[in-house]
Amino acid sequence: GPKGNKGDAASQFGPPGPKGEPGSRGYQGHFGGPGEQGFPGVQGHRGPPGRPGSPGSSGPPGCPGGQGIPGLEGHPGEVGDPGPRGLLGDPGRPGPPGMKGPSGSPGLDGLHGLKGQKGTKGASGLHEMGPPGPMGIPGIKGDKGEPGSPGISPPGLFGERGPPGLPGRPGPVGPMGATGRAPKGDIPDPGPPGDQGLPGPDGPRGAPGPAGPPGSVDLLKGEPGDCGVPGPPGPPGPPGPPGCQGVPGCDGHDGQKGPMGFPGLQGPHGLPGLPGEKGLPGSPGRKGPTGPPGYRGEPGPPADEDSCPRIPGLPGVPGPRGPEGAMGFPGQRGPPGQGCKGEPGLDGKRGRDGVPGAPGPPGHKGDTGEAGRPGAPGPPGPTGDPGPKGLGPGYLSGFLLVLHSQTDQEPACPMGMPRLWTGYSLLYLEGQEKAHNQDLGLAGSCLPIFSTLPFAYCNIHQVCHYAQRNDKSYWLASAGPLPMMPLSEEEIRPYISRCAVCEAPAQAVAVHSQDQSIPPCPRAWRSLWIGYSFLMHTGAGDQGGGQALMSPGSCLEDFRAAPFLECQGRQGTCHFFANEYSFWLTTVPPDLQVFSAPSPDTLKESQAQRQKISRCQVCVKYS
């Protein structure tokens, strides 16, 4: 609450209160500023004698003294440094054969070996995208619109196929369905685009057009004419009867993220928080103004020398040099002085022979001697172990092996198989809406240079055309993420699989297990790689091709639902289109191996798809 008013003064002082508790230890005070110079104090008592002064500096070197008394017998001196190397003496007589010398020091480390060849690609790991979350409960279906009125005109005759009609008017928007009962979930990131729906049924055949004028008869066939101008749009026909119910569409993917909602209302005030911890001591305040000089204090009582510790005084000033003292006893040998070197003294008397010294430490290792003369040839050594089996004849048989990496990196040939060339993995071509397939196990599927349209077409009039029709090429794809827009120019490079053609000692074949186990190679054959059983493929216009199941091209090292991409030759772009399909051999469960009907299934998770695809292995016979 607020502070109360000051109370009235008491008439008399009360009794003294009880003794308070000792206060908490205060924080260390800050250093105060230097005070003003005080008045000179009273002369103190005589202090204790000071410490002995520090030794004075060295005096100048004295004059050379007279000859001293011969000293005591000295200790044997240290071994001197080895003298300089003597001159080369005359060659001595050949000595007897020496003892076998010690083992030499280990030699220097050998050079690093050459880089090994790239190993075969391992099996695909499990680093796929996790399974999608559970699907919410579908909302209530909206009301069905009223059917249109039936047409009045009778059906017309079947005419020639007319030009594509104009797009119809948009129909009225149906009423919105009721809100679903499922709780609202979090909106994930936009999913990949869904598959393209099935093509709709053909429209009714138009009326036959008028007959054209008769053409003139020429000797030579003319060039194809220019494209005609599109005719005027025909009148809209009467509405037709309602069609049959369509095939249910595929499950749609998650929609795109919706817009951000409006900010919510302000929440209620929270409860008051707990009291905070005690704060740190504040910074020192500013220095206050200098106070007035204080009064001179009274002289203090005489000091008690026993109660006060004696503080040693400062070293005294060096006193005057005293008189020269008497000659003292010979002291211990001092350290060498810094004066000038004196004159050499007279030679002393020869001392007695010293006691033989202790054996000195072994000397340093001498220099390496000169190389000896070559010895006589030794006896022949024992016969060595037989060497490993050779690689066979000095040439291969001319069989070709094609490897497709399904990445943007060139694959390495197996050990012992030289590489002939590298390139890009061509799957098939489409011209005049007809497909021409390439077996991925043959060398023709590895083109050295990539092009979205690697061919032209020619006619009997000696004229060739390039990039004037909607021709296409299809290539094995790499592991890059699916792009949202068609790729062009340098954007295409990371999406095309690389390949290599190698020379093999024998023909390679593929074996398929039709289950999840890796099939073994035949006896006396070795493995080149393992993979998944790739059967066939289709693209635009239901055109495509397939792989022979004995060909190595039917065993791709990695499984992908979209293993190839389409390149539009004329536009120079590539993309993964929704009408591209890949077909794979599947696993056959043991309970369905006796001519039983398969059960339909839809697999959306990558791991479940891999478990359904047959495994395979490519083998080659030992040479």
UniProtKB/Swiss-Prot annotation:
Main role? Type IV collagen is the major structural component of glomerular basement membranes (GBM), forming a 'chicken-wire' meshwork together with laminins, proteoglycans and entactin/nidogen.
Spell out the post-translational modification annotation for this entry: Prolines at the third position of the tripeptide repeating unit (G-X-Y) are hydroxylated in some or all of the chains.
Give the region (Triple-helical region) as residue ranges: 1-392
Q: Which PANTHER family match?
A: COL_CUTICLE_N DOMAIN-CONTAINING PROTEIN-RELATED (PTHR24023:SF1112), COLLAGEN ALPHA (PTHR24023)
**What family is this protein classified in?**
Belongs to the type IV collagen family.
Superkingdom of source: Eukaryota
Q: Where is the composition biased (Basic and acidic residues)?
A: 344-353
Q: How does it assemble?
A: There are six type IV collagen isoforms, alpha 1(IV)-alpha 6(IV), each of which can form a triple helix structure with 2 other chains to generate type IV collagen network. The alpha 3(IV) chain forms a triple helical protomer with alpha 4(IV) and alpha 5(IV); this triple helical structure dimerizes through NC1-NC1 domain interactions such that the alpha 3(IV), alpha 4(IV) and alpha 5(IV) chains of one protomer connect with the alpha 5(IV), alpha 4(IV) and alpha 3(IV) chains of the opposite promoter, respectively. Associates with LAMB2 at the neuromuscular junction and in GBM.
Q: Tell me where in or outside the cell this protein is found.
A: Secreted, Extracellular space, Extracellular matrix, Basement membrane
Q: Name one GO biological process term.
A: extracellular matrix organization
Q: What is this protein called?
A: Collagen alpha-4(IV) chain
Disulphide bridges, residue numbers:
413-502, 446-499, 458-464, 521-619, 555-616, 567-574
Low complexity: bias regions: 81-91, 147-163, 262-284
What terms describe the molecular function in GO for this protein? extracellular matrix structural constituent conferring tensile strength
User: Compositionally biased, Pro residues: which spans?
Assistant: 164-173, 230-242, 376-385
- InterPro entries, alphabetized: Collagen (IPR008160), Collagen_IV_NC (IPR001442), Collagen_IV_NC_sf (IPR036954), Collagen_superfamily (IPR050149), CTDL_fold (IPR016187)
* Keyword match Hydrolase: no
- Domain named Collagen IV NC1 is located at 398-623
| Recorded domain comment | Alpha chains of type IV collagen have a non-collagenous domain (NC1) at their C-terminus, frequent interruptions of the G-X-Y repeats in the long central triple-helical domain (which may cause flexibility in the triple helix), and a short N-terminal triple-helical 7S domain.
One cellular component term from this protein's GO annotations in UniProt: collagen trimer
A UniProt-annotated Pfam family: C4
